[in-house]
Amino acid sequence: MASLGAIGLCIALVLSSYSVIGSFLGKSIKISALEESARRAVYVLLLVVFVSTVSLVTAFINRDFQVAYVAAHSNLAMPNIYTWVAFYAGNEGSLLFIALALAVLSSIAIRLAPARSRETLAYTVGILMLVETFFLAVMIFMANPFDTLPLTPSDGEGINPLLTHFGMFFHPPALMSGLIGLTIPFAFAMSSLIGKQSNDEWVDAGRTWGIISWVLLASGLLLGSWWAYTILGWGGFWFWDPVENAAFMPWLALTAFIHSIMVQKRRGMFRMWNIVLINVAFALALYGMFMNRGGPVPSVHSFGASDLGLVFLSFLAAGILIPFLIFFWRFNSLKSTQSLDSMLSREAAFLLNNLLFLGIAFVTLWGTVYPLLSKLGSGEEITVARPFYDQVNGPLMLLLILLMGIGPLIPWRQANLASIKRALLIPTMVGTVSYTHLTLPTICSV
């Protein structure tokens, strides 16, 4: 089975490379048959990656300790129920899962692409498969889950005890799928720019897949908090750990994007801003995967020491630089058809909402990387603990909660103070009565 899985990865790499070349070449020389062939290669790739996945799972079930990855993450005493968890317990298996998740999501996105996005779908396919090619190449040449040992041990090292929790069946898959799922809206956005469209064609697909990725990331974060609360014993469900932060930051940027894209769909505004937001979210997702695989800041959530850090850092740099260049190439086409009529409007509330989300993300990023910057600059590694995040992000989150209550009550285009006061009157009264009802018994008992 190990040989079958390894061969499957090689075939998948050939298919993804062909899909990248066929998509861009077919579009540039206007050969629709080549574009269609490149699209169909994605479906075949999904089948091949699935076969490789089944091969690795089967190796775990059979306790094939000749496979180095199986020997490192399972043993004879491990219950079969933890086979799925062991599958993605290390770098090699998690990379295979990410490749599978991207293949599944890409196949669905290509198949169900809205009619407005069909004109540039070849570019979308090319971008998706370019990312897939990266993960497959890393697996084959640097972290192959099907590498074998020269001598087969009688037993394996066993699964990490921290992973023997019910939440681990869903937390890592949801988180990894959410992070890699951000490639889908990113690809639709970039293909719209490359294809020199009016920049509204990608909105439907971008918003749909943005929401799907948001749900996956949110589920992963919630399940991870549950796991941390019950297993790690921190006395809480959130510790502002570097890898926790690395998953939280793209969720923040994605939340801002989902809100902002509604304004573009309804009013034709924030075109440039939405491209920036989805690029930021994608870059932060790549940063999250970098942190999990040999990132410079230690974390209890990471896969430990790895030589993949530099490779992922290079990919992260490319994932920031190339979209940045495309953005400035198409800068003039991103001007919105409408302008902000008033700062007292729902559009302005959405914009402030975006700035608060990005502010929280920036503070979190700064706190995460500051120990590394301090070590590089002064030689001293300063630990940024929970109080920093609570003190700086706390006020921003309170403002965000306040805006969440007010924003939906503000009309589109333009409002006035009188209409806002009328809209807030009943919610304020209900909130005051509810607060009094909840706190009065406590006050009276003192």
Short names for language-model regions:
Residues 1-406, 412-413, 417-420, 424-430, ...:
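Polytopic transmembrane helical bundles with strong interfacial aromatic enrichment
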Residues 437-446:
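Single conserved hydrophobic/aromatic residue that forms the stacking wall/gate
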